[in-house]
Every structure is written in C-alpha cells, then in structure tokens.
C-alpha cells in the first residue's frame, strides 16, 4: 500500500502541471495513467502537432511541451504508475483507497482527475474497406509528419486538428485537400485566417460542402478519395494519404462507476474550485464540465492551481494556506521522478 497526499489520474499536460502545483504546496503525488509513457494525447496521438496558445511560446510542439512540464514537475519526485488504470475507489473516513488494474493500492487524501477524454480512440468515417488502408494510407493520428513529405493529402474535418494539420503539413506536402461538410470551420479564428491565406497560394484546396464517400486504391495504397455533396454530386481527388479528424470516442471506464456526477462523458464540477460531488475529489482539464468551460490546456492549468490550493486544508488537516507567490518559494533540488 502506497501512502500519499494526492493521487492524480492522468499524466497529460494538465495532470503534469497539477504535479508541479501540488509540489509547490508541499504535497506528495502519485500519478496513474493508462498509457505506457507520460504525456497523454500530446505524446500518444500528435507529438509533432504545433500548439499556439501556451503563454510565452508563440509556437511549441506537443512533445516539447510535455518535456518541459515533466522537467518542471521533476523536483517534487512524483511516482508514476503507468500502463494501468484506476479501477476501484473506496472512501475511508477522510481518505481514499484506489486500486489499479495492476493491483497497485494507493491511499490518498485527495484525488485529482485529469484524464482528458478518458480512454480514447478515433471516430472513424463510415467508408467501405477503410480498414484495408489504415496505417498505410489512412492515419487518424500523426507522430511523424516527415512521412507525408511530397504526398497528395486529403484531410477531412473542420475543427482544430484538421485545420492545424493542414497548415502544418502545407510546407512539406505536394498538395492538400481539406474536406469539410460546411463552409464554416470551427477551429480557432486565427488558425482559420492562416488556412485561408495559405489556400490562396493553392498549397491547400478547400473542398467545402462535401463529405467523404469512398476510397479507391490497391494493396493498401490509396490512389484517390471520392467526396460527395448534398446533391449527391461526386468529385474524385487524386491522393495517396487520407487523414480523417472527426474527434475521439470517449470512455470514462471505471470512473463512471465511482458515484460522480457524469454527463455526456464529462464530470460535473463546481466552477470555483473544480470539486466534484464527492468531497476531496476534483476534476480538471477536458474531462471537467461547468458552465462557461473552455477546453484549452491553459484553462486546465488554472484549474489545477485552484483545485490544489483548495485541497490544501484537507491534505494538512485543516491548516490554513498562507498564499505565496512562486518567486518566494524554494522548489528544492532537481531529481528524477519515479515510474512504477
């Protein structure tokens, strides 16, 4: 049985920043994550994706962001329990006992759920025989954009992932078609502005009012993508790569059985300190929901700070927290975190 102050479920960017915040407040942390490495979707799904809304970084790729967050958290010696899920919760007086899928037992006064989308997988387009092309010509995630150099690429979707990858790949691809069923994109306005600017150079062709209809190719090698509009008119796009970005399937797994208020795969929290309906359990980042919620990494960072400051008195048996700025605190010697 491990004993700690805080258990953080999820080792994505928000979970890692929560480790740092807890450490700054003198709290010990154990971190549970279902993946084999820390970083969440930033590492597993899109390590080379550029991120534009992190303060002080005009642009930073996801992998580098995780590297910096892990470095920031390292002085506080977090213990990582990777490749395992939190499956059982037992409340005992003023503490919790958590059991993982590897039978790891952890006793903690506070739980911070920073599980992002929970267990995740791509929403796949309903195209005949698409599985024949997967991993060779059809990709749902990008972990090495260099493999797309000189290719003719169809990107499908209208959100941030579709627009950001169209922009990012436009400087190495031969041609990009961005297919979206509407004329309006839901990505960040500045990203849409950049997209339309690049489209004027013909590096990106916007195919709006169309949806994916069929794939054509041989031996797992794509030759063209057929798209169709609302009047059933079709168009053939010569392409050897398809990147469908239609979001992720969300699955809270065992968290859904913990007695938390769950709505549409999200955990309801109060908007002051992000505490759930169970005292001592908080939810932050994309998994948390409240009125006015913004799904930004930056928002998750702020939620981590607020929730852990609120949890201080629970961890330290009612002791009042005397707020200090980080410039007055000593983070101690840097040391390596521990993975279990």
UniProtKB/Swiss-Prot annotation:
FAD binds at residues 33, 41, 46, 86, 120, 286, 327. Belongs to the ferredoxin--NADP reductase type 2 family. GO terms for molecular function: ferredoxin-NADP+ reductase activity; flavin adenine dinucleotide binding; NADP binding. Keywords: FAD, Flavoprotein, NADP, Oxidoreductase. The lineage of its organism: Bacteria, Pseudomonadati, Pseudomonadota, Alphaproteobacteria, Rickettsiales. This is Ferredoxin--NADP reductase. Binds 1 FAD per subunit. It comes from the Bacteria. It is an enzyme of class 1 (oxidoreductase). Homodimer. InterPro entries: FAD/NAD-bd_sf (IPR036188), FAD/NAD-binding_dom (IPR023753), Fd--NADP_Rdtase_type_2 (IPR022890), Ferredoxin-NADP_redctase_2 (IPR050097). Coiled coil: none annotated. It comes from Rickettsia rickettsii (strain Iowa).
């Amino acid at each position: 049985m491990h004993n700690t102050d805080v258990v953080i479920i999820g080792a994505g960017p928000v979970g890692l920043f929560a480790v740092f915040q807890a450490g700054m407040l003198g709290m010990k942390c154990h971190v549970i994550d279902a993946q084999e490495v820390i970083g969440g979707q930033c590492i597993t799904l899109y390590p080379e994706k550029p991120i534009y809304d992190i303060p002080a970084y005009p642009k930073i790729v996801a992998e580098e962001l995780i590297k910096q967050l892990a470095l920031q958290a390292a002085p506080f010696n977090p213990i990582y329990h990777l490749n395992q899920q939190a499956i059982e919760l037992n409340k005992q007086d003023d503490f919790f006992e958590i059991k993982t899928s590897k039978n790891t037992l952890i006793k903690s006064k506070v739980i911070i759920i920073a599980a992002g989308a929970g267990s995740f997988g791509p929403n796949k387009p309903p195209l005949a025989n698409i599985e024949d092309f997967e991993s060779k010509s059809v990709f749902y995630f990008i972990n090495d954009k260099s493999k797309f150099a000189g290719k003719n690429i169809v990107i499908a979707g209208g959100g941030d992932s579709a627009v950001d990858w169209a922009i990012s790949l436009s400087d190495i691809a031969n041609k990009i078609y961005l297919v979206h069923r509407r004329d309006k994109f839901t990505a960040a306005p500045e990203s849409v502005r950049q997209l339309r600017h690049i489209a004027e150079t013909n590096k990106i062709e916007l195919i709006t009012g169309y949806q994916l209809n069929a794939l054509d190719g041989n031996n797992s090698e794509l030759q063209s993508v057929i798209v169709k509009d609302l009047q059933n008119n079709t168009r053939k796009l010569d392409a050897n790569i398809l990147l469908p970005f239609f979001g992720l399937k969300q699955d809270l797994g065992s968290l859904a059985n913990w007695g938390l208020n769950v709505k549409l795969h999200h955990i309801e929290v109060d908007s002051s300190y992000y505490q759930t309906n169970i005292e001592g359990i908080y939810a932050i980042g994309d998994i948390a929901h409240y009125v006015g919620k913004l799904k930004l990494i930056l928002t998750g960072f702020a939620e981590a700070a607020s929730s852990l400051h609120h949890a201080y008195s629970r961890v330290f048996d009612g002791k009042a927290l005397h707020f200090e700025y980080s410039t007055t605190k000593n983070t101690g010697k840097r040391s390596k975190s521990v993975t279990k």
